[in-house]
């Protein structure tokens, strides 16, 4: 067992967080990760409506008594999802950890913080991680260019990005992108991360 600021903050055994993954992050996977000692994540927008997310959260509670979280990605667009509805489902479902991604979660921080929810924001640069810290996020997921899905615009690999994040951030951060085994976990910890994000 490795004890870090992230394991203590999230009340997990291992400093491993399952990243939100569209069309994959269902209750079964989240519960399996949480039962193994990491932090499982349900991908919020994989659920078509807030009511569907509420049902998925309830299913996950039936499969694990360990902490798990919900990913909520804020996307630009003309027809935004019902973010207030998803946040209501998260709060009413007793979720205490939310992983945010995409645009800044600043507009949605008040209800999350009022509910006592820990917010981890995915960032592809140190400047975005500093902004996450400034708006009250509890931790950052620092995503190097190796990450899948949404690698950002700066193309900075983790070997450069993680040590810079460690120099600048006061909040704990986890390393994301290219993390897949114990050696990479150890390397991430050596570069200042408090854990890793896989998936």
Predicted features, each with a name:
Residues 156-198:
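Catalytic alpha/beta core domains of metabolic enzymes, predominantly
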Residues 36-37, 136, 192-194, 199:
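Active-site-proximal glycine-rich helix-loop-beta segment
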Residues 1-168, 172:
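Active-site entrance/lid segments in N-terminal catalytic domains of soluble metabolic enzymes
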